[in-house]
Amino acid sequence: MSNEPFGPNEWALILGGSSGFGLATAHKLSEHGLNICIVHRDRRGAMSRIEPEFNRIRDRGVSLATYNKDALNKEVRSEIVKELTDLMGEDGRIRVLLHSIAFGNLKLIGPEPPARATARARLAEELGVEETRLTEVADRLFEQGCDGLQGITTAPEYSSDLLDEEDMARTVHSMGTSLLGWTQEILERSLFTADARVLGLTSEGNSVAWKGYAAVAAAKAALESVSRSIAAEMASSGIRSNLVQAGVTDTPALRMIPGSFHLKAQARVRNPFNRLTTPSDVANVIYLLSLPEAAWINGEIIRVDGGECISGVSE
């Protein structure tokens, strides 16, 4: 008799599962016997990295279905759900729906102000060295892990092309409200288990204004609203909806943010454990939220950051 918490006909459907949090979660849940369906959007050149990861999941003896298609397209969504329904068979059901789509716009909403005199310039003057030389040394040491130097390193560069309403709307849909359409379609087809989980990922950027993050922050706020409403209105269908607020994590999505190197440095300095959150840290908590024992957790935002968000301590 298996001690695993998931039945042989139960599945996890992961939107955005070829890297980062989604892939780590696919690995974690498959380790415990959950069948996996991954929807992702990647170029052909990336598949040489992705396919070995998919093979690792298959090697655990679970079923794996993958769709390299646009999860944001309504018709494509319906096609995938239909194909998955046929694949799962009459007894197959979705235990976990994870929204991990990271497709957003990272433009500023206003122009950058002119450069002003900085602490770096004052320090160079006091030391009697050229500011350019001081900057070179600070940048080199910063890249080597001296996080406390971030205030005197070269500032991040941002595009002069500013965010517009269309950029904002696309990002809010892709990283926020698209969860609703997937949840509704799966529910309408009666594909959820009697004790199902709808999960998503948010970040501290939902309440802190990071430069270039305005559209993603709006999307995360929308995602939080959708998750709360699912928790309240779909509980009668056996659905528990929660979000994980991950700490700063070195993922492909983070690296797309201008100034991400500085964000990582700030997080390491601020975190009580002086390290970044990892995708595995987050996947472990998603697994815990998927267990039967977590059935009374509903409508919550769970911080998974080692205390980063609440820490006022720095080195």
Residue ranges and their predicted role:
Residues 271-282, 293:
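A conserved structural motif in NAD(P)-dependent oxidoreductases
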Residues 240-250, 290, 303-305:
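Conserved SDR Rossmann-fold cofactor-binding beta-strand/turn motif
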Residues 49, 212-215, 236, 243, ...:
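A glycine/serine/threonine-rich, flexible loop-to-helix segment
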Residues 102-223, 227-236, 248-249:
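Catalytic loop of short-chain dehydrogenase/reductase
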